[in-house]
Structures are given as C-alpha cells and as structure tokens.
Amino acid sequence: MSGMSFLATDTKGDLYRNYGRITKEDYHYNVAVIDLRNPTQSDGNNLLHLVNKYMDAYKENPDDISLKARAEKYAKIIAKTLIYGDGDASAYGQNAFFYDSAEGLMTSVILLIAEFAEPKERHIVSVFKLIQELMAPSNVKGKNHFQLLLDRLPMDHKARWFAGAALSAGEQAMASVMSTALSRLNSFFGYGDGTGVVL
C-alpha cells in the first residue's frame, strides 16, 4: 500500500470510475466500494476476517497462544461494536447487565464460529443464525441449547469465559440476553431503508 488510508465520498461514482484504476495500479492502494443504496454492488467485507485469520494461525501453531489471544481480542471488538453501536455503554442504565451479557455471548458465538464452522460459514450472518437456533427451548429444564452447547466445551475454553454472565443467568434473563444480541445484530443487518446488509 502507498501512503495513508483515506475515505472519499463519491455519490455519483465519478471518482471511482475515473480514478479507481489509477489509484489501484499506479499508487498500489486497495480500493473498495461501499454502495449503501445497492449493497449487492459493494465490495465484500467479512467482519470476522481477522478472528478467522488468527484462529486458523493458532490451529496451525497451537503452542503460540498469542495468536488465539488476537482472535479473542478481535471477536470482543466486533461484539462490542455491534452491541454498543453508538459507543456509549453508560446510556443503557438499568439494562446494562443485558447489554454487557449480550456482548459476552456474542463474543463467545463469534469464537465458536471461527473455531468450529466450515470456512464458507465463518461470517457474521452465521453468528446471527446460531444465536437464533440456540435460543430454542431444550428438553433439559432450566437450560437452553446455548447453555447445553457450552457444557460440551472444556471448562477452560474461552467461549465459556466470555459467556459467563449469560450462562449464570436464569431462564428469563438468559432469553433477554439472547434477544438483546439478536436485536443488535438485526439492527446491523437491515435498517428498513435498503441500507443494511443483505442476508
């Protein structure tokens, strides 16, 4: 890459059409298009890219725990960004427990997807779908499918640690935490005006 990163607004597409190739080929910039009016025409971006990258590197080098720590760091950043989209965690007042727990739950699910899902399924939509599926009531009294899934992991698995507050909550509180996570993901995916992520 050449020089500093920058963002240029281009409402008509003239900048990209006239200078995109030059910027790419002559100045070696990575040029990406984000079209909010027509998201399917945008360049793709996998929010879980860095989590997946470091999780894969850790799987190849299991002795280097710094790689797994990086995957966990990026999973936490993604979850925090999606849960606290406006950046102000203090604004949630009495509901702070649910938002904090939803952040931990989402971090946990992101790590599970990065570690165990098939490569083509390792993206944010899979996080949404997995949380939705795991919300279903189970045949075990007092536990939903998410809790049963995490029970299958070793006690020292970080996915269990991140989900700790949610795992220790009662049935109703756990359902609220999962609903909060789904709600925040849902608001990220679509805004009702065509500017959201296409599922």
Protein language model features and the residues they cover:
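P-loop NTPase motor domains
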Residues: 1-199
